[in-house]
């Protein structure tokens, strides 16, 4: 997370076949929806610009978390109240912490807008 926003996010997956539970909180977001995505690279030397595009090993179209055809990194939006920490609570069955398409070592980006 770059800029005035900061936070901690946890990824938990019990087995390679289980969904990933994403929990945590982000501070400093403006009121409204903010895109929440895993990007391709774990490089933040130049802020989010160094993180590359959304993680998309299947070369699919951008989509919502419930879409069958979507970037693996498309985890939807989080809703910020603007005056308090923003909770992150996502369960996703497409991302994984195992194997070649693991998100481990990649960058989580919270976008300014949805």
Swiss-Prot record:
InterPro entries: SOD-like_Cu/Zn_dom_sf, SOD_Cu/Zn_/chaperone, SOD_Cu_Zn_dom. Zn(2+) binds at residues 54, 62, 71, 74. It is found in: Cytoplasm. Keywords: Antioxidant, Copper, Cytoplasm, Metal-binding, Oxidoreductase, Zinc. SUPFAM superfamilies: Cu,Zn superoxide dismutase-like. GO terms for molecular function: copper ion binding; superoxide dismutase activity. Cu cation binds at residues 37, 39, 54, 111. Residues 59-73 have a biased composition (Basic and acidic residues). Its EC number is 1.15.1.1. Binds 1 copper ion per subunit. Binds 1 zinc ion per subunit. One of its GO terms (cellular component) is cytoplasm. Pfam families: Sod_Cu (PF00080). Its main location: cytoplasm. Its cofactor is Cu cation; Zn(2+). Residues 54-80 are annotated as: Disordered. It catalyses: 2 superoxide + 2 H(+) = H2O2 + O2. The keyword Oxidoreductase applies. Belongs to the Cu-Zn superoxide dismutase family. Destroys radicals which are normally produced within the cells and which are toxic to biological systems. PANTHER family: SUPEROXIDE DISMUTASE CU-ZN -RELATED (PTHR10003). Homodimer. This is Superoxide dismutase [Cu-Zn]. It comes from Drosophila tolteca (Fruit fly). The gene is Sod1.
